[in-house]
């Protein structure tokens, strides 16, 4: 989902 992109950016 979109959370994957958001979290992926924050938890890079």
From Swiss-Prot:
Annotated keywords: Amidation, Antibiotic, Antimicrobial, Fungicide, Immunity, Innate immunity, Membrane, Secreted, Target cell membrane, Target membrane
Known tissue expression: Expressed by the venom gland.
Compartments where found: Secreted; Target cell membrane
Residues modified to Arginine amide: 12
Main localization of the protein described in the UniProt heading: secreted
Impact after mutating residue 4 to K: In HAL-1/10; loss of hemolytic activity and increase (~3-fold) in antibacterial activity against Pseudomonas aeruginosa
One cellular component term from this protein's GO annotations in UniProt: extracellular region
Biological process according to GO: defense response to bacterium; defense response to fungus; innate immune response; killing of cells of another organism
Note: More than 20 analogs have been synthesized to study the effect on cationicity, hydrophobicity, alpha-helicity, amphipathicity, antibacterial, antifungal and hemolytic activities. A decrease of hemolytic activity is accompanied by undesirable decrease of antimicrobial potency.
Reported function: Short linear cationic amphipathic alpha-helical antimicrobial peptide (AMP) with potent activity against both Gram-positive and Gram-negative bacteria, and moderate activity against the yeast C.albicans. Has been tested on B.subtilis (MIC=0.8 uM), S.aureus (MIC=7.7 uM), E.coli (MIC=3.8 uM), P.aeruginosa (MIC=45 uM), and the yeast C.albicans (MIC=6.2 uM). Has also noticeable hemolytic activity (LC(50)=102 uM on human erythrocytes, and 82 uM on rat cells), indicating it cannot be considered for therapeutic application.
The family this protein is said to belong to: Belongs to the lasioglossin-like family.
Full protein name: Halictine-1
